[in-house]
Amino acid sequence: AILEEKYAKQIALVLDAAEPGMTISLDMKDAIDIAKKENSDLGSIVSIKDNLVVVKLSEKGGYSYSFFNDLQFDGVISNYYLNQAKTGFIFVIG
C-alpha cells in the first residue's frame, strides 16, 4: 500500500508538470516486483482516467491520486505503457 501511494502521487505530480510532446519514463521496479509476486497483470498496475491516477499492485487495495493538468488520456494524450524491460512505465504526452 505504501508503494501504491508513493507511485500514484509521483505519477500525478509528473503529469501536472507535463507538456505536450514530452515522453516520461518512470522506474517502478520495486512495485513491479511486488505485482509479479501477486500475479497481477503488469500492464494494468497503473491506470489513468478523468485526471485520476490509480496504482494497484494486487487484487486487494490500490491507491488513487488526482492531478490537475488538463491532459486527457483518451487518445488525445497518446498513451502510457509498460517499458520493454518491464521495470517501469513510459508516459507519452500528446
Identify the residue ranges that each predicted region occupies.
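Long, compositionally biased, intrinsically disordered regions
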Residues: 1-94
